[in-house]
A protein has these predicted regions:
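Bacterial N-terminal signal peptides that target proteins for export
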Residues: 2-14
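N-terminal lobe/hinge region of extracytoplasmic solute-binding protein
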Residues: 34-86, 123, 208-210
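A structural "hinge/loop" feature
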Residues: 38-54, 78, 105-108, 174-184, ...
Length: 306
């Protein structure tokens, strides 16, 4: 993956979009990111595209555990510590205290994060009887594709600040699984309020999370505007406003970058790479992707084998 950055006194950026929350200089007030497209929604449980994750799970939500930026090392997130049973089948997570939720025009939280939110976030994906399971299409491709409905026997609340995952078998990468975008934690209190109001889909369209930014405005195919969340439990953002300027054409993204209309752009055209490297005002960053692409034979059709 390649990310291009406009060098200026207002911006310092690490290896991923997450770094925007911690690496901008103190002088920076607004950071504009030329996104490559509109998100499919704002609930990362329901989608699989990186474009959607960049706009939802990264700025808006947290997970029990996280990946250390630029690595696959698992570090504490909403869970400050955890234990694994000797048989490798029970994971006990101890939640951080004092983690606050965003709010919006329709909902004001009355409590902080607790174990009910964690249980709800996974039960929605696993349990076909959960009232939210079929809301917004009810497609949980990552959760189901990774075999988690069969792996996770139970997610249970021990107390307000402790939650347990009971597995059907030991699973070495389970912690890393919980650091992925689809494992973002949503508010059960907000979900209950929207269900009671008869508008459950708003949970997925008007997001409320615990992340460093909260959603202010979304204009499809135009822009997304976020503001720094004053109550964020982690390292405070060093910018006040984050704007996604939705720009599908890579050439247009590059032109905006050159004019400083945006300070960050992903996925430049390969033909532009050489020019970018020669431009001292642009910092071109490269990092290996985690996805693997391949071609395979279709062995399900007999006539293709003759």
């Amino acid at each position: 993956m390649r990310i291009s950055l406009k060098k200026s006194g207002m911006l310092k950026l690490g290896l991923s979009l997450v770094a925007m929350t911690v690496a901008a200089s103190v002088q920076a007030k607004t950071l504009v990111y030329c996104s490559e497209g509109s998100p499919e929604g704002f609930n990362p449980q329901l989608f699989t595209s990186g474009t959607t994750y960049d706009a939802s799970s990264v700025p808006l939500y947290n997970r029990l555990v996280e990946f250390k930026i630029g690595t696959t090392e698992v570090i504490p997130g909403l869970a400050e510590k955890w234990e694994v049973s000797e048989d490798g089948k029970t994971y006990t997570f101890h939640l951080r205290k004092g983690v606050k939720w965003h709010d919006n025009k329709e909902f004001k939280p009355t409590r902080e994060l607790n174990a009910d939110d964690v249980v709800f976030s996974f039960d929605r994906q696993k349990n076909a009887q959960n009232p939210y399971h079929k809301v917004s299409g009810g497609s949980y491709e990552y959760f189901e594709g990774m075999g988690l409905p069969e792996l996770i026997s139970e997610v249970k609340k021990v107390d307000d600040n402790t939650v347990q995952f009971v597995l059907t078998r030991p699973e070495a990468p389970f912690l890393a699984d919980l650091a992925m975008d689809f494992a973002s934690i949503l508010s059960k209190e907000y979900a209950d309020a929207m269900m009671k109001a008869g508008t459950p889909e708003k949970l997925d369209l008007n997001p409320i999370g615990t992340g460093p930014f909260q959603l202010q405005q979304y204009q499809k195919d135009s822009r997304i505007r976020y503001k720094a969340f004053d109550g964020y439990w982690g390292t405070k953002p060093q910018i006040d406003t984050l704007v996604f300027s939705i720009t599908p054409d890579a050439s247009v993204r590059y032109a905006k970058l050159q004019k400083n209309e945006c300070q960050v752009m992903p996925y430049p055209n390969p033909a532009d790479i050489a020019r970018m490297k020669q431009d001292k005002s642009i910092n071109l960053m490269e990092m290996p992707g985690l996805n693997v692409g391949y071609l395979s034979y279709n062995v399900q059709k007999n006539h293709l084998m003759t």
